[in-house]
């Protein structure tokens, strides 16, 4: 079986000279290698084709046969690496926390410790008859987050 570590290392070597970065490598039964890459701007089909050719040059089909899929991380795919969070600062995201609660808000910041999201909440001030909307910044560590993904809104 082809090792994920070997494939990841080859990809990192190839992408080191570009603005693309590795999001994930999955090796499925039957040696199906699925590679996801991303970019702070956009990943082109040429980027995917170039990486695919590079991997085919460096992995020997005579030793072990495999099937290869190289693609970009989809816009609705959950974020898997910190750089995807940083790329989406200022965008609206949907988060599912491990405690089961789901929230939407604007991603304010992200670093190796976690993320800060601005969330709108309805709060009833003391003595008021109606609830008012307030925006609060909430911090979460990556251990608390099950997934985060870009929120697409059609208006």
Swiss-Prot record:
It is found in: Cytoplasm. This is Ribosome maturation factor RimP. One of its GO terms (biological process) is translation. GO terms for cellular component: cytosol. Its main location: cytoplasm. Required for maturation of 30S ribosomal subunits. HAMAP family: RimP. Belongs to the RimP family. Keywords: Cytoplasm, Ribosome biogenesis. NCBIfam families: PRK02001.1. Pfam families: DUF150_C (PF17384), RimP_N (PF02576).
